[in-house]
Protein backbone atom coordinates (compact mmCIF):
# COMPACT_ATOMS: atom_id res chain seq x y z
CA UNK A 1 0.00 0.00 0.00
CA UNK A 2 2.98 2.32 -0.36
CA UNK A 3 2.41 2.28 -4.09
CA UNK A 4 -0.47 3.16 -6.37
CA UNK A 5 -0.64 -0.50 -7.43
CA UNK A 6 -2.23 -1.55 -4.14
CA UNK A 7 -5.90 -1.98 -4.86
CA UNK A 8 -6.33 -5.52 -3.62
CA UNK A 9 -8.68 -7.10 -1.14
CA UNK A 10 -8.76 -10.38 0.75
CA UNK A 11 -11.94 -12.43 1.20
CA UNK A 12 -12.06 -14.95 4.05
CA UNK A 13 -15.04 -17.30 3.74
CA UNK A 14 -15.89 -20.66 5.32
CA UNK A 15 -14.81 -23.59 3.15
CA UNK A 16 -18.44 -24.69 3.02
CA UNK A 17 -19.84 -21.28 1.98
CA UNK A 18 -21.81 -21.31 -1.25
CA UNK A 19 -23.57 -18.68 -3.31
CA UNK A 20 -26.95 -18.02 -1.73
CA UNK A 21 -25.89 -18.81 1.86
CA UNK A 22 -26.41 -15.15 2.89
CA UNK A 23 -23.69 -15.09 5.55
CA UNK A 24 -23.03 -11.75 7.30
CA UNK A 25 -20.08 -9.77 5.95
CA UNK A 26 -17.48 -7.74 7.86
CA UNK A 27 -15.26 -5.35 5.86
CA UNK A 28 -12.18 -4.23 7.81
CA UNK A 29 -10.36 -0.95 7.03
CA UNK A 30 -6.85 -0.83 8.50
CA UNK A 31 -5.37 2.03 10.48
CA UNK A 32 -1.93 3.58 10.19
CA UNK A 33 -2.48 7.33 10.15
CA UNK A 34 -3.31 7.26 6.43
CA UNK A 35 0.44 6.77 5.85
CA UNK A 36 1.03 3.10 6.72
CA UNK A 37 -0.65 -0.24 7.31
CA UNK A 38 -2.23 -2.82 5.06
CA UNK A 39 -5.22 -5.13 4.77
CA UNK A 40 -3.29 -8.19 5.90
CA UNK A 41 -2.01 -6.89 9.25
CA UNK A 42 -1.17 -9.71 11.64
CA UNK A 43 -2.96 -8.17 14.63
CA UNK A 44 -6.31 -8.43 12.85
CA UNK A 45 -6.92 -12.09 12.13
CA UNK A 46 -9.23 -12.34 9.10
CA UNK A 47 -9.03 -16.15 8.86
CA UNK A 48 -10.81 -16.44 12.25
CA UNK A 49 -14.01 -14.82 10.95
CA UNK A 50 -15.15 -17.78 8.84
CA UNK A 51 -15.00 -20.04 11.93
CA UNK A 52 -17.70 -17.78 13.38
CA UNK A 53 -19.91 -17.93 10.28
CA UNK A 54 -18.87 -14.50 9.03
CA UNK A 55 -17.28 -13.61 5.71
CA UNK A 56 -14.39 -11.25 6.33
CA UNK A 57 -12.96 -8.83 3.81
CA UNK A 58 -9.83 -6.74 4.26
CA UNK A 59 -8.79 -4.08 1.78
CA UNK A 60 -5.89 -1.88 0.83
CA UNK A 61 -6.02 1.73 -0.27
CA UNK A 62 -3.57 4.38 -1.41
CA UNK A 63 -1.71 6.03 1.46
CA UNK A 64 0.27 9.21 2.03
CA UNK A 65 0.72 11.42 -1.04
CA UNK A 66 -0.58 8.67 -3.35
CA UNK A 67 -3.85 8.65 -1.46
CA UNK A 68 -4.34 12.23 -0.36
CA UNK A 69 -2.52 14.62 -2.70
CA UNK A 70 -4.59 17.71 -3.44
CA UNK A 71 -3.73 19.87 -6.47
CA UNK A 72 -5.82 22.12 -8.70
CA UNK A 73 -4.31 20.41 -11.76
CA UNK A 74 -5.78 17.09 -10.58
CA UNK A 75 -9.15 18.73 -9.99
CA UNK A 76 -9.10 20.03 -13.57
CA UNK A 77 -8.41 16.50 -14.85
CA UNK A 78 -10.89 14.51 -12.78
CA UNK A 79 -13.36 16.99 -11.33
CA UNK A 80 -12.13 16.36 -7.77
CA UNK A 81 -8.85 16.22 -5.88
CA UNK A 82 -7.65 14.68 -2.63
CA UNK A 83 -9.07 11.79 -0.62
CA UNK A 84 -8.20 9.17 -3.23
CA UNK A 85 -7.57 6.72 -0.38
CA UNK A 86 -11.16 7.13 0.83
CA UNK A 87 -12.38 6.75 -2.75
CA UNK A 88 -10.39 3.50 -3.01
CA UNK A 89 -12.10 2.24 0.15
CA UNK A 90 -15.52 3.18 -1.20
CA UNK A 91 -14.76 1.40 -4.48
CA UNK A 92 -13.73 -1.75 -2.56
CA UNK A 93 -16.90 -1.62 -0.44
CA UNK A 94 -18.96 -1.26 -3.63
CA UNK A 95 -17.13 -4.28 -5.10
CA UNK A 96 -18.02 -6.27 -1.97
CA UNK A 97 -21.67 -5.21 -2.23
CA UNK A 98 -21.76 -6.25 -5.91
CA UNK A 99 -19.79 -9.52 -5.63
CA UNK A 100 -19.97 -10.98 -2.11
CA UNK A 101 -22.89 -13.27 -2.98
CA UNK A 102 -20.49 -15.38 -5.07
CA UNK A 103 -18.60 -16.12 -1.83
CA UNK A 104 -21.76 -16.96 0.15
CA UNK A 105 -22.15 -13.48 1.63
CA UNK A 106 -25.25 -11.35 2.06
CA UNK A 107 -24.95 -8.03 0.20
CA UNK A 108 -27.72 -6.71 2.45
CA UNK A 109 -25.84 -7.54 5.66
CA UNK A 110 -22.49 -5.74 5.39
CA UNK A 111 -20.76 -4.16 8.38
CA UNK A 112 -17.74 -1.92 7.88
CA UNK A 113 -15.18 -1.73 10.66
CA UNK A 114 -12.03 0.31 11.06
CA UNK A 115 -9.28 0.81 13.58
CA UNK A 116 -7.57 4.18 14.16
CA UNK A 117 -7.36 5.88 10.73
CA UNK A 118 -9.62 3.05 9.55
CA UNK A 119 -12.18 4.16 12.15
CA UNK A 120 -11.92 7.73 10.87
CA UNK A 121 -12.52 6.34 7.39
CA UNK A 122 -15.59 4.47 8.62
CA UNK A 123 -16.92 7.73 10.06
CA UNK A 124 -16.47 9.47 6.72
CA UNK A 125 -18.22 6.62 4.87
CA UNK A 126 -21.13 6.90 7.32
CA UNK A 127 -21.44 10.59 6.47
CA UNK A 128 -20.88 10.40 2.72
CA UNK A 129 -23.80 10.25 0.28
CA UNK A 130 -21.46 8.35 -2.07
CA UNK A 131 -21.67 5.25 0.15
CA UNK A 132 -25.44 5.25 0.74
CA UNK A 133 -26.72 1.69 0.65
CA UNK A 134 -23.28 0.04 0.41
CA UNK A 135 -23.24 -1.14 4.04
CA UNK A 136 -25.67 -1.49 6.92
CA UNK A 137 -23.68 -1.17 10.14
CA UNK A 138 -20.41 0.41 11.21
CA UNK A 139 -17.86 -0.18 13.96
CA UNK A 140 -15.22 2.44 14.82
CA UNK A 141 -12.41 1.15 17.03
CA UNK A 142 -9.84 3.52 18.51
CA UNK A 143 -10.63 6.48 16.30
CA UNK A 144 -13.49 8.31 14.70
CA UNK A 145 -15.79 10.71 16.45
CA UNK A 146 -15.34 14.44 16.43
CA UNK A 147 -11.74 15.43 15.78
CA UNK A 148 -9.87 18.40 14.34
CA UNK A 149 -8.41 15.92 11.83
CA UNK A 150 -11.87 15.27 10.44
CA UNK A 151 -12.99 18.88 10.14
CA UNK A 152 -13.96 19.43 6.51
CA UNK A 153 -11.67 21.77 4.63
CA UNK A 154 -11.79 23.01 1.08
CA UNK A 155 -9.16 21.56 -1.28
CA UNK A 156 -7.83 25.07 -1.87
CA UNK A 157 -6.43 25.06 1.70
CA UNK A 158 -3.96 22.36 0.63
CA UNK A 159 -2.87 23.63 -2.78
CA UNK A 160 0.05 25.72 -1.47
CA UNK A 161 1.35 22.80 0.60
CA UNK A 162 1.30 20.38 -2.34
CA UNK A 163 2.83 22.94 -4.70
CA UNK A 164 5.66 23.33 -2.15
CA UNK A 165 6.10 19.53 -2.13
CA UNK A 166 6.31 19.60 -5.93
CA UNK A 167 8.90 22.38 -5.81
CA UNK A 168 10.89 20.42 -3.21
CA UNK A 169 11.05 17.57 -5.72
CA UNK A 170 12.26 19.99 -8.40
CA UNK A 171 8.98 19.86 -10.31
CA UNK A 172 7.09 22.70 -11.95
CA UNK A 173 4.35 20.67 -13.62
CA UNK A 174 2.08 17.80 -12.68
CA UNK A 175 3.65 15.69 -15.46
CA UNK A 176 7.10 16.20 -13.92
CA UNK A 177 5.74 15.35 -10.46
CA UNK A 178 4.13 12.15 -11.74
CA UNK A 179 7.52 11.07 -13.10
CA UNK A 180 9.14 11.29 -9.64
CA UNK A 181 9.66 7.90 -8.00
CA UNK A 182 7.68 7.52 -4.78
CA UNK A 183 10.84 6.11 -3.22
Q: What function would you assign to each model-found segment?
A:
Residues 1-174:
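Serine-hydrolase-like catalytic core of hydrolytic proteins
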Residues 180-181:
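Short, Lys/Arg-enriched alpha-helical recognition elements, typified by the DNA-recognition helix
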Amino acid sequence: TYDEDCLFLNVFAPDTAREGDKLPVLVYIHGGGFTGGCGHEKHFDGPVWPTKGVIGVTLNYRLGPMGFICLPELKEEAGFTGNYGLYDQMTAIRWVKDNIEAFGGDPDNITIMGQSAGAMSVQQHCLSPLTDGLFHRAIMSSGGGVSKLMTPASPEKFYDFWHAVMANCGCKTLAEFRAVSPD
